[in-house]
């Protein structure tokens, strides 16, 4: 661990193993160290009078952003300070009590909606800063390749931002819409059923597909990245297991285009399209981009939602090993 950050920003970041006590202690150490420098994130100094892990974690969450200068737009161009501090903040949230995490997010929202620039020429600064933090939030919580990817936490962020009394109507509407979609088909919930038409022009129900595990793969035949990802999935030995069925669905409305495309997917996969693109036009599933992947269990409960390829394969290895015993 670096004294000035719980982990470094990098593409292969892994979850730190801190307990709440270690988190609070680490933040105290970091705050003392950063007090002596000018280029690091200004972590809060935890009072010595706070002895329990819970009170120390609560203090860190409530005061994490107190010493950060939100009016300084140059900090948007210093990822070693701002992005590092934000990434560490995101990493802490699942490690503290949910109520404590909520207070931390609310404190950040209050700062973002109370930026004082002091100059008339800087009237756009608050919006620029909020947009910057919105981009960071999407990067760390919304990107399936991020080790901190968490749709539920992302939705909580957006809900809290939307609920701030200083949020504009446009901000509130946008954040509420995004949060509502992110909450659809979360891990642990039953995946919403839908109708699809298969390659034999037969109408089917997703829930009627009999399989120990279903890999639901939303794709577009004109999407190169979709074919690259499909090839990676097909190369996994686990997807050849009788315990796994792959259902590849075109979720958009141009079904005639889909019908004219020769399949490039494995013959063992079930393919189909959503009639009239109902999956997306009716917001049955929130598909921000394709490919979009869900792993479902036998009862069609969501096990994984848009996992990284590595997480998907590791999970399939465990599940197929158990299923085949």
Predicted regions mapped to residue ranges:
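Bacterial Sec-dependent N-terminal signal peptides
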Residues: 1-40
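Structural microenvironment flanking redox-active thiols in thiol-disulfide oxidoreductases
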Residues: 227-263, 277-281
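Thiol/disulfide oxidoreductase modules built on the thioredoxin-like
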Residues: 277-317
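Oxidative protein folding and maturation machinery
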Residues: 36-201
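Short active-site neighborhood of thiol/selenol oxidoreductases, capturing the structured segment around
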Residues: 205-230, 246-247
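Conserved beta-strand segments of alpha/beta enzyme cores
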Residues: 245, 268-270
């Amino acid at each position: 661990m670096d004294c000035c950050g719980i982990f470094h920003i990098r593409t292969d970041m892994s979850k730190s193993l801190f307990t709440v006590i270690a988190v609070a202690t680490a933040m105290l150490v970091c705050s003392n160290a950063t007090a002596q420098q000018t280029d690091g994130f200004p972590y809060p100094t935890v009072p010595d009078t706070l002895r329990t892990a819970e009170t120390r974690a609560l203090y860190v969450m409530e005061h994490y952003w107190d010493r950060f200068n939100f009016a300084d737009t140059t900090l948007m161009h210093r990822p070693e300070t701002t992005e590092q501090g934000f990434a560490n903040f995101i990493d802490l949230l699942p490690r503290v009590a949910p109520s404590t995490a909520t207070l931390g997010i609310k404190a950040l929202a209050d700062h973002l909606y109370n930026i004082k620039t002091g100059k008339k020429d800087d009237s756009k600064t608050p919006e620029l800063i909020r947009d910057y933090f919105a981009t960071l939030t999407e990067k760390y919580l919304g990107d399936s390749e991020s080790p901190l990817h968490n749709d539920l936490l992302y939705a909580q962020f957006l809900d809290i931002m939307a609920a701030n009394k200083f949020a504009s109507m446009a901000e509130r509407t946008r954040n509420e819409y995004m949060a509502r979609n992110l909450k659809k088909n979360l891990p642990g919930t039953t995946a919403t059923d839908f109708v699809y038409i298969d390659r034999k022009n037969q109408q089917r129900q997703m829930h009627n597909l009999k399989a120990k595990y279903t890999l639901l793969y939303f794709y577009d035949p004109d999407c190169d990245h979709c074919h690259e990802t499909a090839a990676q999935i097909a190369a996994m030995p686990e997807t050849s297991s009788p315990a796994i069925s792959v259902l590849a669905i075109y979720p958009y409305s141009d079904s005639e285009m889909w019908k004219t495309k020769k399949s490039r997917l494995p013959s063992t996969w079930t393919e189909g399209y959503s009639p009239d693109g109902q999956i997306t036009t009716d917001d049955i599933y929130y598909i921000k981009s394709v490919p979009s992947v869900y792993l479902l269990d036998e009862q069609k409960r969501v096990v994984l939602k848009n996992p990284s390829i590595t997480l998907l394969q590791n999970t399939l290895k465990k599940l197929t090993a158990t299923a085949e015993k």
